A protein has these predicted regions:
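N-terminal "domain-start" segment that seeds a small globular fold
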Residues: 24-48
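Bacterial N-terminal signal peptides
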Residues: 9-20
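Hydrophobic beta-strand anchors of alpha/beta hydrolase catalytic cores
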Residues: 57-58, 88, 157
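Thiol/disulfide oxidoreductase modules built on the thioredoxin-like
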Residues: 119, 127-182
Length: 185
């Protein structure tokens, strides 16, 4: 097997592992985020402007992310129990633009993945060309993106309050991540 091909998954795993407990809370310096629109896997359009007054939770993932397999079902169950399921978006933004992957996620891979972890397609969005990722990154939602390039750590959860301001960014979730999300909702 080509050793070069083995480097990328190892590098990705190490970045995720080493930075998995990094948390940035922006509660004091709330960044205003721009509005956005994105389609879910069922074809329905989500427009953030129609959700003003309600918090939004965005969870960025990719299909080969081991921590995502644990975080996503737990977050889905938590948001369901809180009655906030309509404000939860799982966003796959693992695209060629990151330049660390030869084989980006596809809609088919995402559907297989979410079937495996039992997440309904209405909650899952495919940021195929990285538009939402870029908007959020340029707005400061991913502090590590400036430090290490365009890479966003996975899973990454951001919470936007009802005024459209960023109140929490968890890059690489870890133990107690649900408590941190609940605290700012």
């Amino acid at each position: 097997m080509n050793k070069t091909l083995l480097k990328y998954p190892i590098i990705i795993f190490l970045l995720i592992f080493l930075l998995s407990l990094n948390e940035v809370s922006l509660a004091q310096d709330q960044t205003q985020l721009p509005s956005f629109r994105i389609r879910n896997l069922s074809g329905e359009l989500f427009d953030s402007r129609k959700h003003l007054g309600k918090p939004l939770v965005l969870s960025f993932f990719f299909t080969r992310c081991p921590p995502c397999r644990k975080e996503m079902p737990a977050l889905h169950q938590f948001m369901s129990q809180e009655g906030l399921l309509e404000e939860l978006l799982f966003v796959d933004s693992y695209v060629k633009a990151l330049k660390i992957v030869d084989e980006p996620d596809t809609e088919r891979k995402i559907k297989n993945f979410i079937n495996l972890i039992k997440i309904p397609p209405e909650r899952v969005y495919f940021d195929e060309i990285g538009t939402l990722l870029k908007i959020m990154s340029q707005s400061g939602a991913f502090p590590n993106a400036k430090r290490i390039g365009t890479l966003v750590l996975y899973p990454t959860i951001i919470v936007i309050n009802g005024s459209g301001k960023l109140v929490l960014s968890l890059e690489g979730t870890g133990p107690g991540f649900l408590d941190k999300v609940k605290k700012v909702l």
